[in-house]
Amino acid sequence: NSVVLGKKQRFHSWG
């Protein structure tokens, strides 16, 4: 779960 959250957070930062 932590991995998904980190990936999502990183993607959000890009946008």
From Swiss-Prot:
Sequence positions bearing Glycine amide: 15
Q: One GO CC annotation, please? A: extracellular region
Q: Mainly resides where?
A: secreted
Q: Does the keyword Secreted apply?
A: yes
Show the coiled coil region(s).
Answer: none
Can you supply a Gene Ontology BP term from the record? neuropeptide signaling pathway
Highest taxon, organism lineage: Eukaryota
Q: Which UniProt keywords apply?
A: Amidation, Neuropeptide, Secreted
Where is it made, tissue-wise?
Expressed in the CNS but not in midgut, ring gland, thoracic perisympathetic organs (tPSO) or abdominal perisympathetic organs (aPSO) (at protein level).
> Does the keyword section mention Secreted?
yes
Name its cellular compartments: Secreted
Q: What does this protein do?
A: Acts through intracellular calcium in Malpighian tubule stellate cells to raise chloride conductance.
The name on file for this protein is: Leucokinin-like peptide
Native organism is Delia radicum (Cabbage root fly)
